[in-house]
Amino acid sequence: MQKYISEARLLLALAIPVILAQIAQTAMGFVDTVMAGGYSATDMAAVAIGTSIWLPAILFGHGLLLALTPVIAQLNGSGRRERIAHQVRQGFWLAGFVSVLIMLVLWNAGYIIRSMENIDPALAEKAVGYLRALLWGAPGYLFFQVARNQCEGLAKTKPGMVMGFIGLLVNIPVNYIFIYGHFGMPELGGVGCGVATAAVYWVMFLAMVSYIKRARSMRDIRNEKGTAKPDPAVMKRLIQLGLPIALALFFEVTLFAVVALLVSPLGIVDVAGHQIALNFSSLMFVLPMSLAAAVTIRVGYRLGQGSTLDAQTAARTGLMVGVCMATLTAIFTVSLREQIALLYNDNPEVVTLAAHLMLLAAVYQISDSIQVIGSGILRGYKDTRSIFYITFTAYWVLGLPSGYILALTDLVVEPMGPAGFWIGFIIGLTSAAIMMMLRMRFLQRMPSAIILQRASR
């Protein structure tokens, strides 16, 4: 029992800074929305439309680079720190190549925006302008993620938290300058949010690089000599590990976007209630997601040390802590669902629907916690391909079709509206949790030699 308590302390010490970093990131998006809304409703809508295209694109790159964390954790645990610098350098090359592709996609996103049904031309132009300003931040964001993954792979999660809050503090005044046109800068409105956010990502990257250069604990990595040219073999391996994660993230983000589109014809009350419940459940999701990042680090480190039993302990502890957290957040959600809905909107119909949907959100929080921490465990074992297959099957083969049938057809019951999609979420997330656990048990029952061989690839 003592080993689980000790492991839980280590996991929480790693996870809490990640939680705070994620809160800072979420707050940046909130600040952009509020400040753009303060300028005009059109500008706020433009930022919202632009963000809906930016997020899937940049999260694809983010997911691809998540492969670095278990690689570095495993090298650190095995005492092969001399190989870390080369992996990080290849991570920067990969981030550079991917950012060029993302920038090309975002530059041409105007075709998508202008093809939207009945979109106001002025709104479309502002959304395109916002994206074309924001896309210059894509390299800065991805380079920052490489540096952050280096630190987190070495079990140092506090730098990412600090840089997140630096970014938030810089974002507010820079937004003010470019939205309203102060200190000689042009008045750009919502487009100014894109300029500010792009600048903030570069500031966060440069601040993280400055920290790494000064950190004594990384001196041996920083001083590593060798070529900085692209290494096709290393980059291929990072892509093999990262691409399934990137696709899984992409499918998850697009799932919720598709559901939002399917809910939109049902009316303002249904859309508002759905959005409130989704926004709140996304905030609660920060907890298991951060714990999953910590579990990846611990499992990778233990496998690097050659201890499959300690890796199992880290995995089981992460799941136990995650279920406890999810139980508490579910109780909190059920108990205060109406008060929470009132924070977003005071329309009685919207509040009633949102409170009902939050009951369903509370049901799936435990499944959601298990599946996301399970994904973190599999990343630690470098078994990322299964994450993609599980996510695709659970969300797109089971969750979305069942939600669609329940919400919009009478094949099973009378059309349930948004609640049908939320039952679909429960089906999808529960299926993902079950499949993640089955895959984890399959891996852990392998002979130790095979587990360690797979982890050292």
UniProtKB/Swiss-Prot annotation:
Protein's membrane topology: Multi-pass membrane protein
Annotated organism of origin: Escherichia coli O9:H4 (strain HS)
Subcellular location: Cell inner membrane
The keyword Cell inner membrane appears for this protein: yes
A GO term, aspect molecular function: xenobiotic transmembrane transporter activity
Transmembrane segments annotated in the record for this chain: 11-31, 53-73, 93-113, 127-147, 160-180, 189-209, 243-263, 276-296, 314-334, 350-370, 387-407, 418-438
Keywords: Antiport, Cell inner membrane, Cell membrane, Ion transport, Membrane, Sodium, Sodium transport, Transmembrane, Transmembrane helix, Transport
Function (record text): Multidrug efflux pump that functions probably as a Na(+)/drug antiporter.
Domain of life: Bacteria
BP-aspect Gene Ontology terms: sodium ion transport; xenobiotic transmembrane transport
Protein name, per record: Multidrug resistance protein MdtK
Main location: membrane
One cellular-component annotation, GO: plasma membrane
PANTHER family according to UniProt: FMN_FAD EXPORTER YEEO-RELATED, MULTIDRUG RESISTANCE PROTEIN NORM-RELATED
Family: Belongs to the multi antimicrobial extrusion (MATE) (TC 2.A.66.1) family. MdtK subfamily.
InterPro entries: MATE_fam, MATE_MdtK, MdtK-like, Multidrug-R_MdtK
